[in-house]
Amino acid sequence: MKKILYHIFLLLCIAVFCISAYKLYGYYKSYKEAKDTYEKIKKDNVKKTNGDRTIDFDKLRAKNPDIVGWVYAKGTGIDYPIVQGKDNKEYLHMDYNKKKSSSGTIFLDHGCDKSFISDNNIIYGHHMKNGTMFAKLLKFREESFLKKHHVIILYTPKKTIYLKVISAYAVKAQDQMPITFANETQKKEYITKIRRMSEPSIKLDDKKIDRIYTFVTCSYERDDNRTYVHAVEE
């Protein structure tokens, strides 16, 4: 009887191992496919000349007309196209080529102006466990990291926008973030609020802020946590 139970236990262990190995392979395959997809998109559409980067938006648009921009933060691995879907679910699990993908695509909130002229331009991306997509946003909450990587570049079909990070923190997911402010006072109050919430201490000059750029990804410190990185034009 003991021998039979031993063999049953052994078979169960083997089955659990095989299922776990299969799942791990599935995760690895999914991560690799997504990484390869975006590396190819970058290779085909980002050109570097004398240190300057240019994005071929005509070529990108021919592949996917939902393209609205490209986000790049030197030294972080953040270097991706930005799309805007019909809602905020469309690109959660669909890559730039409109194929199913756990990594999804970096996307602009569907309520924002696609030309990035909203008062608060909100950009979402997954926090992938292999460090891709917006995973590195969490590093902006570290003061030592932020000192070296405080600039985020946003390329659009019409211009290049240089951004400076003014706040970075993690809190429970906010169901609604303001996209439009009723007046300048409301906008200033919001800026004061997000700066108080910032984990690293960031100096900010007194010049007028026209608009905010908010980058959002999942955090895993607590259930339903998000990391928010806010930036303004330099």
Regions found by a protein language model. Give the residues of each.
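Solvent-exposed, non-transmembrane regions of membrane-associated and secreted proteins
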Residues: 17-234
